[in-house]
A protein has these predicted regions:
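Juxta-kinase regulatory segment immediately upstream of eukaryotic protein kinase catalytic domains
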Residues: 1-36
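ATP-binding glycine-rich phosphate-binding loop
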Residues: 27-53
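Conserved hydrophobic "DFG−1" position in protein kinase catalytic cores
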Residues: 49-52, 62, 96, 110
């Protein structure tokens, strides 16, 4: 299995359709001024931390429906699961979902953290 941090071949934010980028910025409440792409993962969809002019941030995933219908399904399912988690759990909350220019996007709260990396960490989060 390839290393998690080097596995994803993701499109850049600037490569996404302008209408999609505009719709995401509208949902975020202002223009996106900085992007920190997610280097890890195993999908071909966009994923990154977007910072807006007002200083807020959101983690956004996006996929082209025609090219990656399975990712659209996965992201929509993730949004549905996030909506059903009990209040008070230390998890990011869904901020928005949208369809624009043949793409589906999911935005969630930006949280500090990283994926568990060692066997001990994986065991701890599994229990």
């Amino acid at each position: 299995m390839p290393p998690y941090a080097a596995a994803a071949g993701r499109p850049a934010w600037s490569a996404l359709p302008a209408a999609l980028r505009g719709a995401v910025a509208e949902r975020l409440g202002g223009p996106v001024v900085a992007v920190r792409p997610a280097a890890g993962g195993f999908t071909r969809g966009f994923a990154g931390l977007l910072h807006t002019a007002d200083g807020s941030a959101s983690f956004v995933k996006a996929a082209a429906a025609a090219e990656h219908p399975h990712l659209v399904e996965w992201y929509a399912r993730e949004a549905a699961i996030l909506d059903r988690l009990p209040v008070g759990l230390p998890v990011p909350r869904r901020r928005f979902t949208l369809h624009a220019s043949g793409w589906y996007a999911l935005g969630v709260d930006a949280i500090a953290g990283r994926p568990p990396a060692s066997r001990d960490e994986l065991t701890a989060v599994a229990h």
